[in-house]
Every structure is written in C-alpha cells, then in structure tokens.
C-alpha cells in the first residue's frame, strides 16, 4: 500500500446516480486496494428517542449525520489504522449494534448526499465529484426504488420527495456543487466523464507509486 490513501468524494441528489458512479470507479480498478465508505452508515444513533420520534427523522438534513465520527475514522484510515464502521437499521430508525471492520486501502470512495457539505470532510479529499442529474430523473428513480424495494405507495414517495427530499436538495446539496473538482452530468451514462475520471485516478496512483 502507498503511503497515503487517495480519498475521492462522490455526491449528488438522492436518485442522482452517485452510487452507480462510485461502483463504476470500483469496477475499473479490480486489482487495486479500493473501498467505498457511505455517509449513510453514519446516521446518528437515535436510541434515546421513542420510535414515533425516530420515524420523523429527516435523513436529508446535515444534522442527521454523525459526520464527526466519519471524519475521525477517515483520519484513522489515512494513518493506516483499521476502523469499525457503524451500520444503520432503517427498520428501527437508529444505529445498529453491528459494525464492520474497514482495513486501510490505497483508495477510498466517500459517497453520500452531503459529503461535500462539511469543510473538514472536503479538506480530506483529493478529488471531489458532483453527479448532476435533472430533478425529473431523480424523482422517477426514487419512486421506482421506494415502491419496488420498500413496498411504499406512490403517494407516500411523492409526498416525501416534495416535502423533504426536494427542498433539502435545493437548500443543502445543490450548493455543494461549487466545491466539486468534477461535475458529471447524467451520472454513470456519461461514459466520457467516467473515462476521464478513472484515467485521472490511475495517474494519481501511478505517481504515488513512483514517488516511493
């Protein structure tokens, strides 16, 4: 492993394709030590609240995340030390008692809707990516995902999108585009942008090896 891991931040609105872009990067480097860390793993522990209070959680607001812990653990990984990353129980709307061990890698993809919102987290990143997708495309994906995977009704998904997801996107997420080094319109279907990005990452990895 090289001396310091490369940290790549990938953000964008819910349903915008950031996870697909992250997976495209992962698949492009099958022989590298590369892992993805999701901001969603760091939703705050809400075990002190009643279930009725927990179900009202606004998961698209910065306050929902324990970003302090994420920053602390990324710093540990940068120092070459393993960490135990939390997991979140969406059924109970609180942090699970389970964790998973993340070993040091050469590259980490830090993915989530608000990973560019906190300057302390941005400052740890070598490449910052914003996946820019039209509202109409994002809501169509969100409806499909929530109805097929979570069994939710069309009305409930649309109401959540209009009442929470869309306003939070425009209040907190869209503005972080200005911090991005690379903006990828239309996500993973933009093969030119993906090719340019993976070429840049490969160059950074090669330079790191040659500097040893």
Swiss-Prot record:
Domain of life per record: Bacteria
Enzyme Commission numbers on file: 2.7.1.48
Binding site for ATP: 12-19
Keyword Acetylation: no
Places the protein is found: Cytoplasm
GO molecular function annotation: ATP binding; cytidine kinase activity; uridine kinase activity
Main location: cytoplasm
Example GO BP: UMP salvage
Family: Belongs to the uridine kinase family.
HAMAP family xrefs: Uridine_kinase
Record PANTHER family: URIDINE KINASE
Listed NCBIfam families: PRK05480.1 (NF004018), udk (TIGR00235)
Protein name, entry field: Uridine kinase
Primary gene name: udk
């Amino acid at each position: 492993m090289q001396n310091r891991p490369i940290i790549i931040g990938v953000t964008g609105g819910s349903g915008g394709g950031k996870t697909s872009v992250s997976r495209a990067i992962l698949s492009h480097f099958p022989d590298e030590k590369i892992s993805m860390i999701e901001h969603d793993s760091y939703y705050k522990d809400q075990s002190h609240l009643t279930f009725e209070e927990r179900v009202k959680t606004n998961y698209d607001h910065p306050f929902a995340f324990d970003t302090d812990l994420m920053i602390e653990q990324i710093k540990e990984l940068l120092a070459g030390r393993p960490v135990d990353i939390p997991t979140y129980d969406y059924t109970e709307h609180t942090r699970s008692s389970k964790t998973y061990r993340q070993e040091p890698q050469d590259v980490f993809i830090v993915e989530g809707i608000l990973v560019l919102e906190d300057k302390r987290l941005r400052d740890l990143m070598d490449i910052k990516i914003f996946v820019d997708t039209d509202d109409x495309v994002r809501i169509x994906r969100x409806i499909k995902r929530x109805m097929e995977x979570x069994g939710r009704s069309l009305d409930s998904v649309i109401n959540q999108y209009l009442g929470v997801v869309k306003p939070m996107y425009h209040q907190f997420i869209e503005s972080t585009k200005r911090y991005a080094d690379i903006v990828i319109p239309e996500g993973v279907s933009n093969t030119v942008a993906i090719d340019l990005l993976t070429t840049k990452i490969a160059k950074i990895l090669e330079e790191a090896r040659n500097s040893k």
